[in-house]
């Protein structure tokens, strides 16, 4: 026994003579935000109703061709303002899918802020006038690369498959099947790659002639192609106004039986500046909560169109708050998110596909089949994105060669994917196994010597 004790001591000495590698300590972070799901006619974090109390965010506008979530200096500067305002969601219209977004998404998470993300950009999008040509494998590769990049973050709330592709021109409705096919493809990609089932939907223009048809179209047909939510951009409440004067009461009435969550993807009329944002009072009350899950104010920075609550000065290092910044901050404080379910129905239901008329030219619920070259992405992934400097996808790559069968986009995990968006586990300390192994070796030798 004395021999064993001496051998054990020697083994411990050998192990302690090899110091354990010192790992760089990661900065302490807030716990991950709970993921948001779409169920019934509302959004939820666990069993709690979630309301979007947010703002649209794209410094430089669409012509700026920049990604605010890849620029750490810019996003940190603006996230401080978001936190001060009290928003819980931002919408970003364009990102560079060749860049990392880890730092800015973590900063947003630490601030308690979710992201609603458009998957398109001016170079990679559905062309409303040439939808068949623009729905191609090159386009979908960019879309899937964006989805893959942002599905790993717990605070990615939702994806938009399109924004105002359908407008007041009747022939623009012919693009609807291609946007809906993109919705189907994103949902299938998430499932096939084993990624989190992030809600996917469409942001519509508020066009009275086809608003109802558009909403029904994205909620009809087989489940694999139906949207998870519907959103539209609304500027009809122009102060001084009211719930009834603005017509918002009718927009509640008209969607009372709609079977999906709805929110306003843009709101905030600028007819009589400065805006007071008093309509938030209705949006956060039982005037609307049974049907609507909040909305996103348009927009954060002034971009020459009359909107914006801050001015970005010079090299964008300074931010000047306007009166509207203070007004929005006051409104968000004055009208908190409701508690409870808000009267939302817990079950979802599909709509009947709209029939053809002068304002709606889609005559079938059939969708284009995914282009053959894009099918491989479902199992092998999209790979690196082309970014904002890519060649673009208009009239590029293979297009759809036929009509898809209903249910063809049903998902089944065919890849292990990345189902969790949490931080990696810390490196395992192997010293225990080293001690155990060496002790075992000396024990064996000691036994043989006895």
Regions found by a protein language model. Give the residues of each.
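N-terminal carbohydrate-binding accessory modules
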Residues: 2-8, 12-84
């Amino acid at each position: 026994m004395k021999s064993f004790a001496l051998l054990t001591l020697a083994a411990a000495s050998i192990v302690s003579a090899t110091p354990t590698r010192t790992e760089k300590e990661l900065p302490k972070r807030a716990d991950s935000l709970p993921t948001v799901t779409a169920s019934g006619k509302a959004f939820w974090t666990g069993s709690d109703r979630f309301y979007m109390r947010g703002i649209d965010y794209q410094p430089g506008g669409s012509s700026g061709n920049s990604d605010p979530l890849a620029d750490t200096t810019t996003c940190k500067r603006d996230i401080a303002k978001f936190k001060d305002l009290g928003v819980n969601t931002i919408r970003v219209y364009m990102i560079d899918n060749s860049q990392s977004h880890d730092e800015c998404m973590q900063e947003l998470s630490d601030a308690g802020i979710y992201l609603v993300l458009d998957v398109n950009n001016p170079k990679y999008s559905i062309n409303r006038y040439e939808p068949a040509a623009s729905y191609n494998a090159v386009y979908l590769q960019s879309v899937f690369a964006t989805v893959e990049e942002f599905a790993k973050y717990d605070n990615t709330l939702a994806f938009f498959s399109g924004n105002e592709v359908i407008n007041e021109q009747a022939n623009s409705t012919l693009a609807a099947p291609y946007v809906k096919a993109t919705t189907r493809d994103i949902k299938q990609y998430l499932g096939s790659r084993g990624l989190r089932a992030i809600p996917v939907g469409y942001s519509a223009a508020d066009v009275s002639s086809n608003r109802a048809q558009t909403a029904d179209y994205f909620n009809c047909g087989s489940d694999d192609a139906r949207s998870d939510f519907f959103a539209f951009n609304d500027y009809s409440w122009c102060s001084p106004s009211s719930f009834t004067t603005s017509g918002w009461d009718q927009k509640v009435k008209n969607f009372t039986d709609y079977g999906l969550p709805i929110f306003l993807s843009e709101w905030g009329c600028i007819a009589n500046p400065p805006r007071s944002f008093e309509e938030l009072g209705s949006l956060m009350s039982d005037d609307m909560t049974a049907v609507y899950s909040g909305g996103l104010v348009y927009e954060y920075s002034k971009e020459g169109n009359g909107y914006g609550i801050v001015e970005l000065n010079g090299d964008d290092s300074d931010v000047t708050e306007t009166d509207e910044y203070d007004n929005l901050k006051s409104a968000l404080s004055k009208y908190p998110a409701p508690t409870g379910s808000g009267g939302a129905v817990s079950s979802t239901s599909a709509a009947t596909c709209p029939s053809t008329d002068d304002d709606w030219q889609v005559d079938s619920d059939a969708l284009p089949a995914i282009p053959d070259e894009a099918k491989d992405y479902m199992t092998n992934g999209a790979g690196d994105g082309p970014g904002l400097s890519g060649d673009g996808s208009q009239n590029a790559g293979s297009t759809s060669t036929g009509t898809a069968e209903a249910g063809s986009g049903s998902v089944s995990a065919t890849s292990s994917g990345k189902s969790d968006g949490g931080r990696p586990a810390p490196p395992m300390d192997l010293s225990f196994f080293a001690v155990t192994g060496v002790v075992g070796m000396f024990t064996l030798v000691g036994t043989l010597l006895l």
